């Protein structure tokens, strides 16, 4: 199974790339959406979050005020680490279920038994055979590097744009103040470091057509080497 780990900076255009991949028939798992599910009504994680912060993060109707929660965690690294410790295990489990279901489906369609890759060829957290019944899937994980999940992907794609575009897009997308935008950007690894560690870099500073061409080229070229690289040293999926 060819597993694309799609990441980048906040507001650089990961979702746009994900939509392009879906147009190519590639299943995409959205870690951000899974994180939102972790805080859904009735979730034990939501209850722990409400217990910690109380009415400060509740709307008058009793709903979770996600913007207020964001203001708290993006202003305090310790609080952000606590929240991530609640949510990340749930997201990891959801991603593993996504991969397992696709691998099982592929084995039924193609009649190829599921086999683990040799230890020297697999990255931790996945490890499904890349033989006849292999397929391409995408895990869109904004915090792929920060959460030490590099080893979940057979190749890592990083989406970039200019700093000015990044801030403009965030301002258009969310009702954030300039200070809140800077806090969100600062909470992640520098984009230059993500680019340095990427297998594929997609420049989203131009037109949609230009981005689509880059994605098409990456699909054609990078797909020749699934699981070719050993796990990156110094990281685990924990």
UniProtKB/Swiss-Prot annotation:
Reaction(s) the record says it catalyses = 3'-dephospho-CoA + ATP = ADP + CoA + H(+)
Chief subcellular site? cytoplasm
Q: Which GO terms describe its molecular function?
A: ATP binding; dephospho-CoA kinase activity
Q: Where is the DPCK domain?
A: 3-233
Give the InterPro entries listed for this entry: Depp_CoAkinase, P-loop_NTPase
Annotated ATP binding lies at: 11-16
* UniProt-listed Enzyme Commission number(s): 2.7.1.24
PROSITE patterns for the chain:
DPCK
Query: Which CDD domains does the record associate with it?
Result: DPCK
**Domain of life, per lineage:** Bacteria
Question: Could you say which protein family the record assigns here?
Answer: Belongs to the CoaE family.
Query: What name has this protein been given in UniProt?
Result: Dephospho-CoA kinase
Gene label: coaE
